[in-house]
Structure formats: C-alpha cells, structure tokens
C-alpha cells in the first residue's frame, strides 16, 4: 500500500513539530489525501500486520449504534478501553451519532438508514453524508470523533466513499481507519446492489507522535506486497444483519506488526 508509505515519508520530511493534547508531541502536516481503488484489492497495510478482528468488530459496533465497550470486550477487542468509564460507557460517540442523532424535538435521526434509503432512491444525490461531529454533544464524548464525516458518491454503478478525518494518528490510527471505511464501502455497495469504487481518505491534522518516529522509519524500510481481497458473505442484503463470520480476508501476507505506544 504505497499510498500509506508515501504519507509516512511526507510527514517525516515535511511536517512541523508541534505540542499536542496528550503531551507527547507530534510532527504534523495539515491537509493530505489518499485514494484507493477498491477493485484492485482491499487496502490494508502489508508492511505491518493489522488486527482485522478489531477493525471488523468495531465497525459492527458502530453500525449497531452502541456506545458501551461491553460488546468489544466480549469479543476480545480492547482499542477503546482507555477512554471508557467504570461502567464501560463512552458517552455519545460514533454509534449514537450515526444511528440516533438527536433531532431537537425529542426524537432522533438514523443517519445510516437514511443514507441507504437515499442511495437507493436517488443515487446521484450530493447529500449522501453521515456526520459524527455533533457540537451539542461533543463535550460529553469520551473522545471527540477523529473520523468525523463521510460522503458516498455513485457513478456508473460504482459506489465511492470519501472520509474527512480531522485528526489522524498516522502510525496507529490511519491504517485502521482506511480498512474500516473501505470495508464499510464494500458492505454498503453490496446491500445497495452497486459495485465498489474508490475510497478517498482526506486528512486534516495528519500527525506522527514523536515516540512513533523510529517505528515509522522501520516500516518505511519494508517493501509492500500485493493487496489481499475481502470476501463478504453474498447472502447478506441488510447492512445491520452482518456478523463477524460474514467476512474473510483472503491472501493477506504481511510483515510482522510494529509495536508503538498509544497516546491517550
């Protein structure tokens, strides 16, 4: 996945050194875009192995509208543990905003259901958008949304997705985000009868934490391999009916993972 390695190199070479909320320090650029043709393979890093189990379960958890880590914990996924309270709650994070955005009148808006309806009804629409950034609730979230808005686009029977990510931890977070939204695009394409198009990833503050520099340089010494393919159970036609067992990454050959500390 050369696009991702180019991002690592660009930030190392051109980024500005900055302080940050966690006190760790970062090297950062503002504004960067990558594009992945999903017909050419599933965009997952081959220069370090990713934990696909966590990515799939997290996406299913988002789509369920869940904001408590119990489901993740029950399935051995720990990526949200640092931010949960003693009851496992995270506040009104992604799942709530995607599926139950308060409408101001005592009800809620299911953005995902509305998105699917609009893709089927009016695929040329320029309003195929889901936002997780709710200013009225952002202060109550354990972690404000980093990947905060995405838009779908249909052309010639192909479904593309563009994600805007306001804050991008490019060593630990971005590979997960690429795989997660690529998978979401494949799932939405399947249930709406479309073919997968491109995944476009637009980054706002794209940063390497200072304690990830050496790990990034190590990864840049590795040679990317051919991308794997993601098999999705073709029998599933309801986005909310997918289960972990409905996905299988095939022909995934990757170098060993590279450990790096997470900034909380």
From Swiss-Prot:
Binding site for (6R)-5,10-methylene-5,6,7,8-tetrahydrofolate: 51, 169, 263
Active site: 146 (nucleophile)
Keywords, in A-Z order: Cytoplasm, Methyltransferase, Nucleotide biosynthesis, Transferase
Tagged with keyword S-adenosyl-L-methionine: no
Main location: cytoplasm
Coiled coil: none
Biological process terms in GO annotation: dTMP biosynthetic process; dTTP biosynthetic process; methylation
Pathway: Pyrimidine metabolism; dTTP biosynthesis
EC number: 2.1.1.45
GO MF term (any one): thymidylate synthase activity
Reaction equations catalysed: dUMP + (6R)-5,10-methylene-5,6,7,8-tetrahydrofolate = 7,8-dihydrofolate + dTMP
Superkingdom of source: Bacteria
InterPro entries: Thymidate_synth/dCMP_Mease, Thymidate_synth/dCMP_Mease_dom, Thymidate_synth/dCMP_Mease_sf, Thymidylate_synthase, Thymidylate_synthase_AS
CDD domains found in the cross-reference section: TS_Pyrimidine_HMase (cd00351)
Disulfide bridge map: none
One GO term describing the cellular component: cytosol
Subunit comment: Homodimer.
Membership in a protein family: Belongs to the thymidylate synthase family. Bacterial-type ThyA subfamily.
Protein name, entry field: Thymidylate synthase
Organism per entry: Mesorhizobium japonicum (strain LMG 29417 / CECT 9101 / MAFF 303099)
Lineage: Bacteria, Pseudomonadati, Pseudomonadota, Alphaproteobacteria, Hyphomicrobiales
